[in-house]
A protein has these predicted regions:
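Active-site anion-handling motifs in enzyme catalytic cores
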Residues: 1-148
Length: 148
């Protein structure tokens, strides 16, 4: 969670109770000068990625955490974060047919995690592979046009 607040913490607590999981936070608090120094240092990227790899469920408000949740085939929800690029998050989730994973911050207290279905990562991978092929073709065509 990049921009923590009481509603997001309540969602994390509700979800961890329902799923019988213990919340684990990866992000540091660099701006909180009253925190111990160990809580203010950002973890290495490798550690951050390992946490995604090992997570059973992810709650985030970060676009990049949403992307890594998809790449690591994780069950997740993302709280819409107006300050952090909500439109790109909506577009990403629409592209992969995961609109139900987006929680409107205004309705966060009404969100019921048990209403979610498991993500069909076979479909997601198919879409992702199509996007990769398209991107690679575009790149190769662009490079070939420059060489002629």
């Amino acid at each position: 969670i990049l921009d923590s607040n009481e509603e997001k913490e309540a969602l994390i607590n509700r979800t961890s109770t329902q799923k019988k999981l213990s919340p684990y936070y990866v992000n540091a608090k660099p701006d909180d000068i009253w925190r111990p120094i160990t809580e203010r240092i950002q973890p290495p990227v490798e550690f951050w990625l390992k946490c995604f790899m090992n997570a059973q469920f992810i709650i985030t408000d970060s676009f990049h955490a949403c992307v890594f949740s998809i790449l690591f085939h994780k069950e997740f929800v993302v709280v819409g974060n107006q300050k952090r690029g909500l439109s790109r998050m909506k577009e990403l989730l629409q592209d992969f047919r995961m609109e139900d994973r987006l929680i409107d911050e205004a309705n966060i207290s009404d969100f019921d995690i048990s209403s979610l279905h498991l993500i069909d990562y076979t479909l997601v991978d198919k879409i992702l592979n199509e996007r990769r092929r398209y991107s690679l073709n575009w790149l190769m065509n662009s490079l070939n046009d420059k060489n002629e």
